[in-house]
A protein has these predicted regions:
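Anionic-ligand binding patches
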Residues: 117
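Class I SAM-dependent methyltransferase SAM-binding "motif I" and its flanking Rossmann-like core
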Residues: 120-121
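Extended, subdomain-level signal for the structured scaffold at the beginning of enzyme domains
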Residues: 1-96, 104-108, 114, 124
Length: 126
């Protein structure tokens, strides 16, 4: 099983690495890959960078998608490359999940239409 963690500038470290730590406990049952619009370094809101293994154009097929939240969600709401990637890949994955404000991106991509979802209360109106 392959999990893709999708990163963007100013993502929240805990929103990404908390779940990844838990999934990592599955050992060989899961392969975790990191993805961003472009492969390479992606800055977190706290400063430390994560290295994206893949860009949107060369990311492998994914069984699971994890989208962290963070203040960087706001500019990503207007990023068509991000929204298209999420729409396209969520249709092929078994599970697409988000943490906190990451759900705003899933909603903007139309992936939460007709579904109940939670987010940070500051994002209710987005």
């Amino acid at each position: 099983m392959r999990l893709g963690a999708v990163f963007y500038n100013d993502f929240e470290l805990l929103d990404a690495y908390g779940p990844l730590e838990m999934f990592g406990a599955l050992g060989d049952q899961i392969k975790i890959v990191t993805i961003a619009e472009q492969a390479g370094p992606v800055s977190s809101s706290a400063g430390p960078k994560t290295i994206a293994d893949y860009g949107f154009d060369d990311a492998p097929e994914l069984d699971l998608i994890l989208l962290p939240g963070g203040i960087g969600t706001i500019p990503e709401l207007g990023n068509e490359a991000m929204l298209t990637f999420l729409k396209t890949r969520a249709a092929k994955s078994q599970i697409t999940m988000s943490v906190c404000t990451g759900s705003a991106l899933l909603a903007k991509a139309g992936l939460l239409d007709g579904l109940a979802a939670t987010t940070n209360k500051m994002f209710f109106e987005l």
